[in-house]
Amino acid sequence: MTPTLSILIPCFDYDCSKLVADLQRKGDEEGLSLEIIVGDDTLTRLGRARNRNRLAEQASGEWLLIVDCDAAMPPAFSLRKYVEAGRQAPVVCGGLYHPDVNPCPEATLRFKYERKADLRRAARFRQEHPYAQLSTFSLLVRRETFLAIRFDEACVEYGYEDTLFGAELERRGIPILHIDNPLIHMGLEPDAIFLAKTETAMRTLHRLEQKLRGHSHLLATVDRLRRLHLCGLIRCCWRLCRKPLRANLLGKHPSLFLFSVYKLGFFLCLR
């Protein structure tokens, strides 16, 4: 029997057994036939985009529900709500939020960053800019739609595969419906790891700059600075201030403004 949903969980060295059990239990409660496929990329090293594409190829359901491995399921979450929303659009984004209490004491910067972002993660905000706000943390896609687009396999490392997927949906005129059916993001890494992943994302953005032009606020800022011939000055200032910037971001009271400055300076110094 073909499952109602194929739930795809891309994973890298993370125990998602509780998430799998919770999703299966929810499916049983709601009378849904599920197929749950976990793609652990720890040994295969396919990369983020290729791993997700392979999971979609393996799936047999008409609908794919992509869920990040570090998600937790709140009581209000409903798989059936996704199924019903799928009758209105081929792509449905359920959203995410973070716990009220920081689950990782070493993740002060990340927790502060995400909690601020949570303020505009309700569906009514996301639907204002549906493609720019696409997140594959919890995303329902019709299988034939996904396989026609796929994730861009140029995204091997961390960052921007969601952005490219959303941009391609927009280019093809495929509608996205945003709903309030969030999962909880529990996998906050220590700030040193988060900062390293941010630097990796900036390298990805730099490498894929032409593909991402028009889909990145940071690139729009860079373009304005280039027109004003200010990039050289900012590079110089960033190199002088890099150590104190990092000290703030890895400290007890990190500044989100300085985090934005750090990302901009790091990007401009890439060659």
Predicted regions and their residues:
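Non-catalytic, C-terminal membrane-associated alpha-helical segments of glycosyltransferases
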Residues: T200-R203, H217-R271
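Active-site donor/metal-binding and catalytic loop motifs
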Residues: R172, L177-A196, A201-E209
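Short, flexible, basic/aromatic active-site loop/helix in glycosyltransferases
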Residues: F111-Y131
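Acidic donor-binding loop at a coil-to-helix junction in glycosyltransferase catalytic cores
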Residues: E157-F165
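Short aromatic/hydrophobic "clamp" motif used to bind/position activated sugar donors
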Residues: L64
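Glycine-rich, basic loop-to-helix element that forms the pyrophosphate-binding segment
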Residues: L43-A59
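Conserved donor NDP-sugar-binding/catalytic core segment of glycosyltransferases
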Residues: A76-T108
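N-proximal low-complexity "stem/linker" segments adjacent to membrane-targeting elements
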Residues: M1-R25
